[in-house]
């Protein structure tokens, strides 16, 4: 497993962003783990997370000159990532959107650098159904930008349903042709748990969940 994946999963565990047990998801599935990026709730945690994002993005050779953070969780993630790249002597443009249209002041729904003519990397925590990302793609294209990739923290690698064996990430990539990179995946989480003696009791439930709901092909 790549070092940044290991760092991310340990950071998520230490921050309680990654928890093990029994969790009912929005889909109704009972998951043996739960990921909540809202628990990266300090400057140090967010900075460490941004380092993991940047390492994953660089490993994937993503081509972009602007980072876009969808409201709301994507906003601090994109901001922290832009700051991390500044530390790496790469000054990227930054934009995010608001969910409510502002009719006074600067107005509109976009805040930050203009998107027109830019190659844009979208930053978010996870992709669930992909609906929010598709809306962001529409916003970017309408503003004259070109979406060139999506980066998320965790790819759950789950099928959409028993009749649709694609994951939301696979469906999004097939539909749009836009690459999606994740810091870590369910496969990485399995390896992480297997290698960590204190987490050994969670390995079999995770494996059973992956066997039932995991995608047949890697994302």
From Swiss-Prot:
The keyword Zinc does not apply. Orotate binds at residues 34-35, 128, 156. It catalyses: orotidine 5'-phosphate + diphosphate = orotate + 5-phospho-alpha-D-ribose 1-diphosphate. This is Orotate phosphoribosyltransferase. It is an enzyme of class 2 (transferase). One of its GO terms (biological process) is 'de novo' pyrimidine nucleobase biosynthetic process. HAMAP family: PyrE. GO terms for cellular component: cytoplasm. Belongs to the purine/pyrimidine phosphoribosyltransferase family. PyrE subfamily. Catalyzes the transfer of a ribosyl phosphate group from 5-phosphoribose 1-diphosphate to orotate, leading to the formation of orotidine monophosphate (OMP). Pathway: Pyrimidine metabolism; UMP biosynthesis via de novo pathway; UMP from orotate: step 1/2. InterPro entries: OPRT, Or_phspho_trans_dom, PRibTrfase_dom, PRTase-like. GO terms for molecular function: magnesium ion binding; orotate phosphoribosyltransferase activity. Homodimer. Its EC number is 2.4.2.10. Its cofactor is Mg(2+). Keywords: Glycosyltransferase, Magnesium, Pyrimidine biosynthesis, Transferase. 5-phospho-alpha-D-ribose 1-diphosphate binds at residues 26, 72-73, 98-99, 102, 104, 124-132. It comes from Xylella fastidiosa (strain Temecula1 / ATCC 700964).
